[in-house]
């Protein structure tokens, strides 16, 4: 009967040890993926597997010779070691805390005993803390980032808005400049206030953007916006006006072409007079290009300076019965230069 019970205990212990080995091998396969991050854990698991495998042949030999110490050895080394290795860290720490509290209450806290207990622990049990690290080692960093974002949002909510415009500017800066600032739309009312400020400050070429902004007193209006609008206004006033108001009717300014250049009609009408005669030009109006100057009439020479040369050719021979008069005046056509005068 005793041998039968010993065989049953041996089989159960061997089966249990085999289950421990399988569980440890499965854990080693899981850790092998992270062997660079967890080299010590992998080493500990392999050492435990090798220790269990060494225990199996010893158990068989001891069982053959009928030594009962094998059960004590297995339960003393293989079983508790593996159980302690696979247990969760929280349970072990909780037990230690309970023991410490019990010692503190009863005043049995002995530093010598504590040092002895620490020395009796094996090295791999001391380093088992690496195995029970949290699954998310970066979790504290993530929590810290979340706390920073929450505090930043709270500070943004608590930040008061001063004069409206500065608050909007502060919000735009906090957004990180991802979106461009919306351009200001100058309404007619805002432009009238701008013109009123220019009138009081001495005109667009005297007033500065800062003075204009302070005079207008508009929330959210910046110096850059006033400066941009002032530059556009100066360019607009510098351009020549196309329409001149005349009793409520707009009259288009006329231009004439003189020598390939566009000249206003007012400047062209006050031209110089040459040779005592005033040059006048008649203009013809077109619907698209305005007025254009007609070519000036040819200037005729005065009678005092003009002396036409007349050449008289008398006919010779029996066939010529008249006199040919030739005029060399450039104003006469070729058909009227030669006149035949018959002899009476």
Swiss-Prot record:
Chain residues forming the annotated DNA-binding region: 209-234
Disruption phenotype: No visible phenotype under normal growth conditions.
One Pfam family of this chain: Myb_DNA-binding
Region (Disordered): 88-184, 269-322
Biased composition (Basic and acidic residues): 105-124, 138-178
Subcellular location: Nucleus
Factors inducing expression: Induced by nitrate. Down-regulated under nitrate deprivation conditions.
Main localisation: nucleus
Tissues in which the UniProt entry reports expression: Expressed in the root hair region and root hair cells.
Ranges of Low complexity composition bias in the record: 269-291
Source taxon at top rank: Eukaryota
Domain HTH myb-type residues, every copy: 178-238
This protein's UniProt keywords: DNA-binding, Nucleus, Transcription, Transcription regulation
GO BP, one annotated term: cellular response to nitrogen compound
Compositionally biased tracts (Acidic residues): 95-104
Family annotation (InterPro entries): Homeodomain-like_sf, HRS1-like, Myb_dom, Myb_dom_plants, SANT/Myb
GO molecular function: DNA binding; DNA-binding transcription factor activity; DNA-binding transcription repressor activity
Annotated GO CC locations: nucleus
Function: Transcription factor involved in nitrate and phosphate signaling in roots. Integrates nitrate and phosphate starvation responses and adaptation of root architecture depending on nutrient availabilities. Acts downstream of the nitrate sensor and transporter NPF6.3/NRT1.1. Represses primary root development in response to phosphate deficiency conditions, only when nitrate is present. Involved in the modulation of primary root and root hair growth in phosphate-deprived environment.
NCBIfam families, A to Z: myb_SHAQKYF
The protein, known as: Transcription factor HRS1
């Amino acid at each position: 009967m005793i041998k039968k019970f010993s065989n049953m205990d041996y089989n159960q212990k061997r089966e249990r040890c085999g289950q421990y080995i399988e569980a440890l091998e499965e854990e080693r396969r899981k850790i092998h993926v992270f062997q660079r991050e967890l080299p010590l854990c992998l080493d500990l698991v392999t050492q435990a597997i090798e220790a269990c495998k060494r225990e199996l042949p010893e158990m068989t030999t001891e069982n053959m010779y009928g030594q009962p110490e094998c059960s004590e050895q297995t339960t003393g080394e293989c079983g508790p070691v593996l159980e302690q290795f696979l247990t969760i860290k929280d349970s072990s720490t909780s037990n230690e805390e309970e023991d410490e509290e019990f010692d503190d209450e009863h005043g049995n806290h002995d530093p010598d005993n504590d040092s002895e207990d620490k020395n009796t622990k094996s090295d791999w049990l001391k380093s088992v803390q690496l195995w029970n690290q949290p699954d998310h080692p970066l979790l504290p960093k993530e929590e810290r980032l979340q706390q920073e974002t929450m505090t930043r949002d709270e500070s943004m909510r608590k930040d008061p808005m001063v004069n409206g415009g500065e608050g909007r500017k502060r919000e735009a800066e906090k957004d990180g400049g991802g979106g461009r600032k919306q351009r200001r739309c100058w309404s007619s009312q805002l432009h009238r206030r701008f013109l009123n400020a220019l009138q009081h400050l001495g005109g667009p070429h005297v007033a500065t953007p800062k003075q204009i902004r302070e005079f207008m007193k508009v929330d959210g209006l910046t110096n850059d916006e006033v400066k941009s609008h002032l530059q556009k206004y100066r360019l607009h006033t510098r351009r020549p006006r196309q329409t001149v108001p005349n009793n409520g009717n707009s009259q288009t300014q006329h231009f004439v072409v003189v020598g390939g250049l566009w000249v206003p009609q007012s400047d062209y009408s006050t031209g110089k007079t040459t040779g005592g005669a005033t040059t006048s030009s008649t203009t013809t109006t077109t619907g698209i290009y305005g007025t254009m100057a007609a070519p000036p009439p040819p200037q005729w020479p005065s009678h005092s300076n003009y002396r036409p040369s007349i050449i008289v050719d008398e006919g010779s021979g029996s066939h010529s019965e008249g006199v040919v008069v030739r005029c060399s005046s450039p104003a006469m056509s070729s058909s009227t230069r030669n006149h035949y005068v018959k002899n009476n």
